[in-house]
Curated annotation (Swiss-Prot):
Pfam families: BacA
EC numbers on record: 3.6.1.27
Alphabetic keyword roster: Antibiotic resistance, Cell inner membrane, Cell membrane, Cell shape, Cell wall biogenesis/degradation, Hydrolase, Membrane, Peptidoglycan synthesis, Transmembrane, Transmembrane helix
Keyword NADP appears in the UniProt entry: no
Role this protein plays: Catalyzes the dephosphorylation of undecaprenyl diphosphate (UPP). Confers resistance to bacitracin.
Recorded GO MF terms: undecaprenyl-diphosphatase activity
Protein name, as recorded: Undecaprenyl-diphosphatase
Native source organism of the sequence: Rhizobium etli (strain CIAT 652)
Parts of the chain that traverse the membrane: 38-58, 80-100, 107-127, 135-155, 175-195, 213-233, 244-264
Length: 265
């Protein structure tokens, strides 16, 4: 893989990983022109995006750790832990059962379309309720489950699934729902990436990798994800997610058309 392609894939990952539009759907299209991505490459560019969100929320994370004696912080941290543990336990069960859908265009396209419709419904439902900021135990449990659903069905979007489950379950405030979804995503994605990284090294999948290309992709992904998430957090203060939903539906229809015409697998 040449360095320009590595940088472009880093840009795509950085933009799409935490926006509710599915990084998988975009990367599968990019793969047609930029070449196949190795497992190691996927892990590295995702790690860059996770690092960006960790940097953005480092003060909030530090506050939760240092301020654990405060009831509000302790309660919030406990809900983050429960959501993470639900994802971890169910994730291990899914792995053991070997249930996994192929990352091919048609199922991803349908996940994009259905997810877009789901987002529109969630926005409509949330608008009919008071914009509560509270993260309830129900929200924490459902967010944990939503992360697994997103992992099992490529194209769902982890951020999209968790944000809109939180909104439907009672956290009508977009900023509060997004923050919880992103904070849960940090340990979840670090754990998943760490597991996949160890597995890749164990299987010899890191042999022959171009480490310069990996470094470029990682750095680009980190920088672009930082900018994208900062923009998203500012955007949702006064805007709905409807544009993202429409974009998902259009992209899903486009992918279906490409799959039907044989332009993409």
């Amino acid at each position: 893989m040449d360095y320009i392609n590595a940088a472009l894939l880093g840009v795509i990952e950085g933009i799409t990983e935490f926006l509710p539009i599915s990084s998988t759907g975009h990367l599968i299209i990019a793969e047609q022109w930029l070449g196949h991505r190795s497992d190691m490459f996927n892990i590295v560019i995702q790690a860059g995006a996770i690092l960006a969100v960790t940097i953005i929320y480092w003060r909030r994370l530090l506050d939760l750790v240092l301020g654990w004696r405060e009831p509000e912080n302790r309660d919030y941290a406990a809900k983050l832990i429960v959501a993470f543990l639900i994802t971890a336990i169910l994730g291990l069960v899914v792995k053991k059962l070997g249930f996994e859908l192929p990352e091919t265009a048609t199922p991803i396209a349908w996940a994009l379309i259905i997810g877009g419709i789901w987002m529109i419904f969630a926005e409509w439902a949330a608008a009919r309720k008071a914009p509560h900021k509270e993260i309830t135990w129900l929200v924490a449990i459902l967010v944990g489950i939503a992360q697994i659903v997103a992992g099992v069905f490529p194209g769902t979007s982890r951020s999209g699934a968790t944000i809109f489950v939180a909104m439907l379950a009672g956290t009508g405030n977009r900023a509060a729902a997004t923050e919880f979804a992103f904070l849960v995503g940090i340990p979840t994605m670090y754990a998943a990436s760490g597991y996949e990284l160890l597995k890749t090294f164990k299987d010899g999948g890191a042999a022959g990798e171009d480490w310069t290309a990996l470094a470029i992709a990682f750095i680009v992904s980190t920088i672009v994800a930082f900018i994208a998430v900062k923009w998203l957090l500012a955007y949702i203060r006064s805007n709905r997610f409807t544009l993202f939903a429409i974009y998902r539906i259009i992209l899903g229809v486009l992918l279906l058309g490409m799959a039907t015409s044989g332009l993409i697998a």
